[in-house]
């Protein structure tokens, strides 16, 4: 799968930060929690790969939302990061 992120999230990733839902624009493809996904900017430049903390359906529901909104949107709290910095490698 592919996760498209905004410019703010791209800058955060370049500074070694985790990917949060607020920076996600859209997803492409279907994937499960724990799968290796590609992170791209809006121009489809490859930025990083990482292990997703949520499946593609969950990310589609929480994309663009603040971390505090995740629990209300999904009905449970998991993690605040879409991909934690420790589970990501920059390309």
Placement of each model-derived feature along the sequence:
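Beta-strand/loop-dominated core regions that host nucleotide or nucleotide-derived cofactor-binding catalytic loops
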Residues: 2-5, 9-91
């Amino acid at each position: 799968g592919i996760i498209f992120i905004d410019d703010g999230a791209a800058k955060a990733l370049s500074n070694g930060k985790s990917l949060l839902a607020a920076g996600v624009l859209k997803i492409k493809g279907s994937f499960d929690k724990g799968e290796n996904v590609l992170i791209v900017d809006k121009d489809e430049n490859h930025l990083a790969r990482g292990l997703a903390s949520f499946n593609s359906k969950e990310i589609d529901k929480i994309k663009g939302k603040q971390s505090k909104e995740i629990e209300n949107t999904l009905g449970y709290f998991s993690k605040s990061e879409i991909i934690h910095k420790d589970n990501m490698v920059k390309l």
